[in-house]
Amino acid sequence: MIIGIGVDIIEIGRVRQAIRNNKNFLSKLFTEREIDYFISRNMNSEVIAGNFAAKEAVSKALGTGMRGFSFKDIEILRNELGKPEVILHNGANLIGNKLVENNNSLRVHLSISHNNSSAIAYSVLEGEYYGNI
């Protein structure tokens, strides 16, 4: 059963500017594994903006926005084929588990795309619905 959906779009230029103007921007919002992925992609602003939009989309699908957890509690990685995968930690994981009957049944689907100026992410939460947060 679909439990939640979320979408977010962001201007890549705003992310590029934040990276330039704030030396702590990446370390405040992204895990070490995410930053390692960005480095492997030559610190491509489109990739970073896509991950930022993905975190926002997942937070909206959880039904809370970025309340009750930090940006780092939603980790966006890629599998061996490049498909984005979501790992929920700490507060985000607790909120996700409150939504499903069986803690292991929550599945987070994610799609990320971008053009020259914007990045967009769409997330769907699926599982056996248990109740509200």
UniProtKB/Swiss-Prot annotation:
Residues folding into a coiled coil are none
Which cellular component, as a GO term, is one annotated location?
A: cytoplasm
Assigned keywords, A-Z: Cytoplasm, Fatty acid biosynthesis, Fatty acid metabolism, Lipid biosynthesis, Lipid metabolism, Magnesium, Metal-binding, Transferase
Compartments where found: Cytoplasm
Q: What class of enzyme is it?
A: transferase
- Binding of Mg(2+), residues: D8, E56
Q: Which reaction does it catalyse?
A: apo-[ACP] + CoA = holo-[ACP] + adenosine 3',5'-bisphosphate + H(+)
Mind telling me what this protein is named? Holo-[acyl-carrier-protein] synthase
Q: Which organism is it from?
A: Clostridium perfringens (strain SM101 / Type A)
Q: What is the lineage of its organism?
A: Bacteria, Bacillati, Bacillota, Clostridia, Eubacteriales
